[in-house]
Amino acid sequence: MAYTRSKIVDLVDGKIDPDTLHQMLSTPKDPERFVTYVEILQERMPWDDKIILPLGPKLFIVQQKVSKKWTVRCECGHDFCDWKDNWKLSARVHVRDTPQKMEEIYPRLMAPTPSWQVIREYFCPECGTLHDVEAPTPWYPVIHDFSPDIEGFYQEWLGLPVPERADA
C-alpha cells in the first residue's frame, strides 16, 4: 500500500495515528516510500547536500555537493567524520560515572552502580543535539552501531542507482 506524502510528513512529525503507524510498520514497504521520506527530510535541512541515508532523527550520511564525499552530518550542518568511521569518536561525550551524575537522571536507589555500568551521552559539538546514549560497562570501548551497506540497500532493496561517492 502506497502512502500519501502527507501521511509520511505526519510520520516524520510524530503526528501519525497509532493504527496507521502499526500498519506502516507491519506491512511491506511501498517502493517509493524511502525516496519520499528522504525528500521530506531534505526540504527541512538548512544545507543543500544530498541525504544518502538517515542514521537517526537528526543524524545523516550525506553526499557533499561539490566534492561528492560522503560524511556523517548533524541536522545543524556539523560534519562529524567520513561515513565509514564511527561518528561517536568525533562527538562531545558526557559520561555519567559517579553516583551524583547518575542521580541526575535516576532515583537514588534505582541508579546503576558506576563501577558496573556508565552512561555515555553523545552530543553534536556544534548545536548540542543528543544523538545517542550507551550504557556499557566502564571499560568497554565506544560502540560502533553499524556499518551500512549502502550499495546493497540502494541496488538490491530500493532498485535505485547508488549515489556518486568521491572515494568509490
Swiss-Prot record:
Pfam families: Acetone_carb_G. Its cofactor is Fe cation; Mg(2+); Zn(2+). It catalyses: acetone + hydrogencarbonate + 2 ATP + 3 H2O = acetoacetate + 2 AMP + 4 phosphate + 4 H(+). One of its GO terms (biological process) is cellular detoxification of acetone. Optimum pH is 7.6. Zn(2+). The heterohexamer contains tightly bound iron, manganese and zinc ions. GO terms for molecular function: acetone carboxylase activity; ATP binding. Disulfide bonds: none annotated. InterPro entries: Aceto_COase_bsu/gsu. Its EC number is 6.4.1.6. Keywords: ATP-binding, Ligase, Nucleotide-binding. Catalyzes the carboxylation of acetone to form acetoacetate. Has a reduced activity on butanone, and no activity on 2-pentatone, 3-pentatone, 2-hexanone, chloroacetone, pyruvate, phosphoenolpyruvate, acetaldehyde, propionaldehyde and propylene oxide. Heterohexamer of two alpha, two beta and two gamma subunits. This is Acetone carboxylase gamma subunit. It comes from Xanthobacter autotrophicus (strain ATCC BAA-1158 / Py2).
